[in-house]
């Protein structure tokens, strides 16, 4: 019997007890998990250094190293995140609606856990803690499979978390880590229908596509973020520049960072030099189409494959468009359904953009970086769903539940 099947069986068994745990039991567990995380800070940072040293030797990019790195502050933030989940309302047991049929049956909808959640992700060890906290709060057992880049960090984090879970009296197998990071085991996990109720991949396009191609377990796609900002002809240049810089340069390795900049042809000669100067001052390399190159001749030419690429780095590609309609067409062709923004003072164009752009989050005069559970007021999130079934956009606690129908009768037969 493989390690994964054993973990699957243990998770399924744990999910039954965890699913009926009280809010107080779950909140107590989260508090103790946070305490154990802080106690293990030294061990976690030592383990993370092993991962970072290996990543540097492999020539990993600066942006990806930032994703991988753990510091005192980041671990304290992870612990604080667990405590923040305590403050969120527990959705489990909520009766959403109740109605009575003519025959006297009373029918209701009640929120219940999904059961066992599998999460496959890459070099972001903070996901390990975030996912564990959200799953505990919603009564779901979780099987975590992180990338090989962060395996030592993840082991240390899960060791601390499971110590806290065990101390709280909840099943230790509520949170488990798959320590074999081979593709074969990942594929086996994608097909573990007997034990895993839903699979959530978090990572780049390659990982997402591999899961969609191989999984027989139902998948919630947390898609890649090829996010666009369209700067309309009627806009405040200073606002537009500041939004572009924030969306691209504040943290380029995350999925809600802007990857493409579309500029209306009527303002490009005036606006492009301003924004390119600001981008370069923030360390961002700029690629562009032929029109962009004709205005600033040292811009690198953007190839066709650039338009659909998620860089996750200090790179942005610029395209000049005729109007809002061409911008919308380009976004709907190359976007990934994540987050898209228009900078405009035109109400008409803003409404057209909101209605026609097909994405989970569509912005008017704001940075795409706000697509985040905490920024939306949901608290922590498990990921940003770019699909339309079950969940779309930031996935908070309610998105980790399903519906059970409860029916009360007094002897009715059909």
UniProtKB/Swiss-Prot annotation:
Q: What is its main location?
A: cytoplasm
Q: In which pathway does it act?
A: Amino-acid biosynthesis; L-proline biosynthesis; L-glutamate 5-semialdehyde from L-glutamate: step 2/2
Please give one Gene Ontology molecular function term for this protein.
Answer: NADP binding
InterPro entries (alphabetical): Ald_DH/histidinol_DH, Ald_DH_C, Ald_DH_N, Aldehyde_DH_dom, G-glutamylP_reductase_CS, Glu-5-SA_DH, GPR_dom
GO annotation, cellular component aspect: cytoplasm
Gene3D superfamilies, per database record: Aldehyde Dehydrogenase, Chain A, domain 1, Aldehyde Dehydrogenase, Chain A, domain 2
Q: Which UniProt keywords apply?
A: Amino-acid biosynthesis, Cytoplasm, NADP, Oxidoreductase, Proline biosynthesis
**EC number(s)?**
1.2.1.41
- According to the UniProt record, which cysteines are disulfide-bonded? none
Task: Tell me which Gene Ontology terms the entry assigns under biological process.
Answer: L-proline biosynthetic process
List, alphabetically, the Pfam families matched: Aldedh (PF00171)
User: What enzyme category does the UniProt record give?
Assistant: oxidoreductase
> What is known about what this protein does?
Catalyzes the NADPH-dependent reduction of L-glutamate 5-phosphate into L-glutamate 5-semialdehyde and phosphate. The product spontaneously undergoes cyclization to form 1-pyrroline-5-carboxylate.
- Membership in a protein family: Belongs to the gamma-glutamyl phosphate reductase family.
**What HAMAP family does the record tag this protein with?**
ProA
Q: What is this protein called?
A: Gamma-glutamyl phosphate reductase
Source species of the chain:
Clostridium beijerinckii (strain ATCC 51743 / NCIMB 8052)
